[in-house]
Amino acid sequence: MIRNLTKLTKFTIGNRFYQSSSKGRFSGKNGNNAFKSIVGVSVGVSALFAGCVFLDQEKEPESTPSIDVKEKKSQPPKTKEDYQKKMDEEYDIEQFKYVIIGGGTAAYHAIDKILENDKEATILLISKEYEVPYQRPPLTKSLWATKDDNVVNTLNFSDWSGKKQNLLYEQESAYGNEILQFIRTKKVIDLHIDEKLVLLNDGKLIRYDKCLIATGGEPRQLKFTSTNDKKISTYRTVEDFRKLYEVVKDGGKHVTVLGGGFLGSELTCAINSNFQDKNIKIDQIFPESGVLSTLFPDYLSKYATEEIIKSGVNVHTGTLIKDVVDNSENGRLTVTLNNGKTFETDHVVVAAGIIPNTNVVKSTTLEIDPINGGYVVNPELQARTDLYVAGDVASYYDFSLGVRRRVEHHDHARATGEMAGSNMSTKDTPAPYTYQPFFWSDLTPGVGFEAVGNTSSKLKTFSVWEKPSSDETKQSYTKGNIYYLNDNNNVVGVLCYGNYGKMDTARDLILKRRTIEDLNQLQHAIDFDEHH
């Protein structure tokens, strides 16, 4: 057990990632956070489990049993505390005040809040990945623009202002001390909520006082005749970035990207814009009529697709991949489309979205949202007493929109992580999650936006462009605002296309829930002035 924890000094968290403008959306790591307070804290009296702070496990055991908390036969304990103490001793159970399952953005920001609020905290972070927590947006954006082949090792990049950043929120020196410990490359395969026990895939049991599930999602897989995982991959982690970068860095390759959503489109455009001079060719394939079709109105989806084609990408709309097979003659892959066409490629990236990872609880039933997926939580982000959920895997009720949602964007992961961490560690009444997260994307120089709320293309939309034209064929899509309305004519979502820094105004418009009697009321709801 860990004893005599070093006290942390009080700090004030900055407004990381609360900026509404894309020009501030990656301000980097705030130098004034709780992690800085624990860097340099010496490793404690007893190291984690097998005598080391960082534990690696690449292979799962052959059997992964569910949790069995039956007590060995002996003198029965008199109290629950006696029972737990006896059980912990007999089964060699390590105990932490806070256990965080998942090593992403939500987990990082939850830990930051816990360290701020609880000076007596002992925290265990469990991640299936090797890396300590890192930012995901640069994986499809800034990392590709570094022009430095050593980026796969340094993970350094420049933000919008030219400031140097690192993909990792904090370096490894912030982890592995008396206060915060980290288990890498291991999975939680079960939770026993009543006993507050976590079971790892090596059979190790860990007891918690409070636990956060922030497991994110798993990439959707597609089955092909070829099973060559060196040439067919999904794209979700920093390791995926490293592998794909190695494919394209020397040039002269052909890459095929499956998917026309955020991931597929951002990855396609990032590689294309930064490696065209190295003769990298890209085909993007998806079944919809245009990119981001679940977000953009049809006309804008088609326009964005045309812009991507103009940038040099070979885009296949309304198309599915029928199969991918190995070509034994030249070592490449042969792609067959559902329209009968075939072509050869060097690498296939499956970017078909994610499935929320709800596989960490087996012996206890947690409610899963049957429509959106993810664990159902209350307004305070609790799934059960002392068990919280944040990030992509949380299904929560959005009071502003009046619907239950599950959101897969960075700002939401940050905000729910902070809220869950705060509620887990506060001495005050836990607060409800009412924040309206925003998201952004930049595909080509002519396709970039920020958005907030429910921006489903299935909703009614009303578009206001800075330079409107009566001739649709001559319309300039440089700067505009798109409003999404529900059946009651309430604005429930706003997308600001090329019009940055307007998210606070957009949030206010959504929160008012005002019925729009005349759509022309929205003509001047959000201005086109520059706010960077």
UniProtKB/Swiss-Prot annotation:
Question: Which positions are annotated as binding NAD(+) 2?
Answer: 160, 450
State the GO CC annotations: cytoplasm; mitochondrial intermembrane space; mitochondrion; nucleus; pathogen-containing vacuole; phagocytic vesicle
* UniProt subcellular location: Mitochondrion; Cytoplasm; Nucleus
Q: Which InterPro entries match?
A: AIF_C, FAD-oxidoreductase/Apoptosis, FAD/NAD-bd_sf, FAD/NAD-binding_dom, FAD/NAD-linked_Rdtase_dimer_sf
Coiled-coil ranges per the record?
A: none
Which residue ranges are recorded for the region named FAD-dependent oxidoreductase? 98-440
Q: Where is the transit peptide?
A: 1-26
Looking up SMART domains in the UniProt record yields: AIF_C
Q: Which residues are FAD-binding?
A: 102-106, 128-129, 136, 141, 188, 236, 392, 409-410, 440
Positions of NAD(+) 1 binding? 260-263, 288, 353, 408-409, 440
What are the alphabetically sorted keywords of the record? Apoptosis, Cytoplasm, FAD, Flavoprotein, Mitochondrion, NAD, Nucleus, Oxidoreductase, Transit peptide
What the protein does comes down to: Probable NADH oxidoreductase that acts as a caspase-independent mitochondrial effector of apoptotic cell death.
Q: What is this protein called?
A: Apoptosis-inducing factor 1, mitochondrial
- Name of the gene: aif
